[in-house]
Design a protein with these regions (language model features):
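A donor-sugar binding/catalytic signature common to diverse glycosyltransferases
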Residues: 84-95, 105-106, 248-285
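Catalytic donor nucleotide-activated moiety binding site of glycosyltransferases and closely related
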Residues: 43-56, 204-239
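A nucleotide-sugar donor-handling region in carbohydrate enzymes
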Residues: 124-196
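A conserved, positively charged/aromatic
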Residues: 104-106, 116-128, 249
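Catalytic binding pocket for nucleotide-activated donors in carbohydrate/polymer assembly enzymes
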Residues: 268-312
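C-terminal amphipathic helix plus adjacent low-complexity
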Residues: 310-329
Length: 329
């Protein structure tokens, strides 16, 4: 397994446990990016660290990819792997293809064109939610039987055994009398870059000046952390490092996220969630919006800042079914 982003740790945690319970040998590689290493440590997953993120520039990403592919091949060669699993890591599927190892990759956003052109064509199987129309994947060379689809959200599978820790509120000094808003930064490395999502700073400024609100902002990088802290907004809290984000979401009154994973975690846990994503919506988000489980946000003043009164509808699914679809052998 190759883990290249923080969310992948959560996806693979129950699958690793299931495989080891049945006697499989599992080895994990990881890329040093954002909170990936911290989350691996928190969940007790040992991994071989290989490479790092290439940053914003295409040249940097290409150079980093070439170097990491070479290191992955050297590491994997001669280890007699029977299968390789990835969540969107084209590094893994390309390496597996070069070494003749059956592989599968999964993702839930179909418009990451460059990544999917590489990863999908190299993979033996591609596993995606059934909310993604199959015809959108044909340009990546993905058709049945290579295509496998599952019902619901991947978050409904990996959160199936999750029970939130209320102590996370004390760890972050959350005032329970105020409206708790969990905010996830955009994927942009630089929040203040001219091409960055302009809505996100507006949301921060709006929430940060509301006395009735405590907004906990979860940055992706240290650069983002420094930027948000530098705004000195009175109602904004920025944790020092990786936190139990799923527990925080479970106790939140609402979630505002520019990324995909935290939106879907909130939806899976039945928490009101708004998306500020500025790109093209994928099939999963389109379905969630149709179902009323995700709300698009274009103006911060449209946020319903109220205490959540009742438990939302939580959906749990069986991780073993996800593992069955992912196994390429």
């Amino acid at each position: 397994m190759d883990i290249t982003a923080p969310a992948h740790v959560l996806v693979f945690r129950p699958l690793i446990a299931l495989m080891r319970e049945r006697g499989d040998e599992v080895e994990v590689t990881a890329r040093d990016y954002a909170q990936t290493v911290q989350l691996l440590e928190q969940h007790g997953i040992e991994a071989e660290l290989i490479g790092h993120h290439g940053g914003r520039s295409r040249i940097g990403k290409l150079a980093t990819m070439v170097t990491r592919l070479s290191k992955l091949r050297r590491w994997a060669r001669g280890r007699n792997f029977d299968a390789a699993l990835a969540h969107g890591s084209h590094h893994l599927t390309l390496t597996a293809r070069a070494l003749g190892i059956p592989s599968s990759t999964t993702f839930d956003y179909e418009f990451a064109t460059v990544q999917h052109q590489l990863g999908c064509r190299a993979a033996t199987f591609v596993v995606v939610p059934d909310a993604i129309p199959p015809e959108r994947l044909e340009r990546y060379g993905v058709r049945p039987p290579k295509l496998r689809q599952y019902p619901g959200l991947k978050e409904e599978y990996y959160l199936s055994d999750f029970e939130p820790r209320e102590s996370v509120l004390d760890e972050l000094a959350v005032d329970r009398d105020r409206i708790l808003v969990v905010v996830r930064t955009p994927p942009d490395v630089s929040l203040y870059h001219r091409k960055s999502n302009p809505l996100f700073p507006q949301v921060l400024t709006f929430l940060g000046s509301e006395d009735s609100v405590q907004a906990v902002v979860l940055p992706r990088t240290e650069e983002q952390r420094d930027y948000v802290r530098g705004l000195s907004l009175p109602s904004v809290t920025v944790p020092d490092g990786a936190v139990d984000a799923q527990s925080l979401i479970a106790f939140a009154d609402l979630v505002v996220s520019a990324g995909g994973t935290m939106n879907r975690e909130a939806a899976a846990l039945g928490i009101p969630v708004y998306t500020t994503y500025g790109g093209r919506l994928g099939g999963v988000d389109e379905a969630l919006i149709r179902e009323g489980r995700l709300r698009p946000l274009t103006d911060p003043r449209a946020l319903e800042l109220v205490k959540r009164g009742s438990e939302g509808l939580r959906v749990r699914r069986e991780p073993a079914e996800m593992l069955r679809l992912l196994m390429p052998v």
